[in-house]
């Protein structure tokens, strides 16, 4: 038990799927897991453990931003024995060829946050997904007929960023889209020696101004959720 997770040391599976929204964690537990049990609820950051196709899997929200992602990830790894974290969430597209509701496998992530540099003596280390998880997710997507794009993303510290040059710069560098957490997860995973992957769905387009409806988001997010669950299986 920690100040932010009121679970017992063995309550979490070694693999945790982490959406930003704790209510999405609840939805996944109730929709996809069998024998799911709520294991933490501090500050309503809900976490559950259950079974998917006979394998023990946990799901827990991580909140918004790198600081929140790293806080919960650090505690899961160091106090609850978690060995693998798969983030799922939304992404704002920054390339014309990336379309609404596309599923993105984030192979690496840049950031304007100082968080990763602080944990690496001021150096800007590369932050990338675990290749075995990335390859497995890509293979599973092809098997399930889910169209995915693989590439780099960018994790911004500010949702309402006043820098008008950011999106054009990301477009020039071929970055597929922008979120707020992936770089923090990958940096933490490298430092702690665990496996990590982010599977994201394009919910809005930074170049065209398009946005998904709630119904469209639910359908496309289900593809992402199911792909994450399949990737989590041993």
UniProtKB/Swiss-Prot annotation:
Binding site for a purine D-ribonucleoside: 4, 179-181, 203-204
Active site: 204
Single GO biological process annotation from the record: purine nucleoside catabolic process
Example of a GO MF term: purine-nucleoside phosphorylase activity
Residues binding phosphate: 20, 24, 43, 87-90
Enzyme type, top EC level: transferase
Site (Important for catalytic activity): 217
Top-level division of the source organism's lineage: Bacteria
Keywords (A to Z) from UniProt: Glycosyltransferase, Transferase
EC number(s) stated in the UniProt entry for this protein: 2.4.2.1
HAMAP family per record: Pur_nucleosid_phosp
Subunit structure: Homohexamer; trimer of homodimers.
Record-given protein name: Purine nucleoside phosphorylase DeoD-type
Lineage: Bacteria, Pseudomonadati, Pseudomonadota, Gammaproteobacteria, Alteromonadales
